[in-house]
Amino acid sequence: MGFEMKPEKEVLELISSKNQCKSNPNSVKKKNKNKNKKMMMTWRRKKIDSPADGITAVRRLFNTCKEVFSNGGPGVIPSEDKIQQLREILDDMKPEDVGLTPTMPYFRPNSGVEARSSPPITYLHLHQCDQFSIGIFCLPPSGVIPLHNHPGMTVFSKLLFGTMHIKSYDWVVDAPMRDSKTRLAKLKVDSTFTAPCNASILYPEDGGNMHRFTAITACAVLDVLGPPYCNPEGRHCTYFLEFPLDKLSSEDDDVLSSEEEKEGYAWLQERDDNPEDHTNVVGALYRGPKVED
């Protein structure tokens, strides 16, 4: 943590005005010398603790996203170097970098009668363009973002604080579909994560493209999507129901024969109901550091 200090111009003006004092030259000169030395030392320590280039963490994230996704598009995965570049930025992100604390109203659990229902999840929109989007999901305890997909996207997720369970799947590409809305998927992640932890990455066809978030404690997740959802371009957010392999399988199905093979697989069925019927996400104004000019 750095020391609070006035802007450099004010500090230098203050030093200059003090040096112009002429009364009691010996004592005043010594006193001013000590004060000036202390102020300049404080200023130097403040500069050391600040970003070397004077750019905030969220601005650095924005600039990096512009570079990483500059030639992106549906199904286009950034190069490994660019993925690592963005991952390193996200790994260092902290709640205070985006103006969040766990005591904010977004993270309060339901109480009374409301405690029986899933608490609302707040989405803070930071930026969106054709190439990428940046946003934050704020989840109270027991908050759930249902199982959903990310068509043609590369997605970076950074848990800023709290504890969250993540379950994710990828499609089994060569397996026949159960019906027009039901496909076989293989489990990718089924684990609980606690901040601080590194960012996770999913890809168009790998890394757990369909995932569900469940808040164990109050938590916040910073999401970067490249490219973002876009209904006119066919990148819809689709929600799924999850069924054990035996639940929808028949005797004629020979997708997976042995019990060992069946472990870690499930049927994912596209939901027909309105997403608003099973999601409780509300938008709120982002009040953290500026993302762009």
UniProtKB/Swiss-Prot annotation:
Required cofactor(s): Fe(2+)
Domain of life: Eukaryota
CDD domains, sorted: cupin_ADO (cd20289)
Entry's transmembrane regions: none
Location(s) in or outside the cell: Nucleus; Cytoplasm
Entry GO terms, CC: cytosol; nucleus
pH dependence: Optimum pH is 8.5 with CGGAIISDFIPPPR peptide as substrate.
Residue numbers spanned by region Disordered: 250-293
Disulfide cysteine pairs (residue numbers): none
EC numbers: 1.13.11.20
Positions contributing to Fe cation binding: H148, H150, H211
Biased composition (Basic and acidic residues): 269-279
Alphabetical GO biological process terms: anaerobic respiration; cellular response to hypoxia; detection of hypoxia; peptidyl-cysteine oxidation; response to hypoxia
Biased composition (Acidic residues): 251-262
Main localisation: nucleus
Induction: Up-regulated by hypoxia. Up-regulated by the ERF-VII transcription factor RAP2-12 during hypoxia.
Gene Ontology molecular functions: cysteine dioxygenase activity; iron ion binding
Protein task: Catalyzes the oxidation of N-terminal cysteine residues (N-Cys), thus preparing the protein for N-end rule pathway-mediated proteasomal degradation, upstream of the N-end rule enzymes ATE1, ATE2 and PRT6. Controls the preparation of the group VII ethylene response factor (ERF-VII) proteins for degradation via the 26S proteasome N-end rule pathway. Acts as an oxygen sensor that controls the stability of ERF-VII proteins, which are stabilized in flooding-induced hypoxia, and regulate transcriptional adaptation to these adverse conditions.
Protein name, as recorded: Plant cysteine oxidase 1
Gene coding for it: PCO1
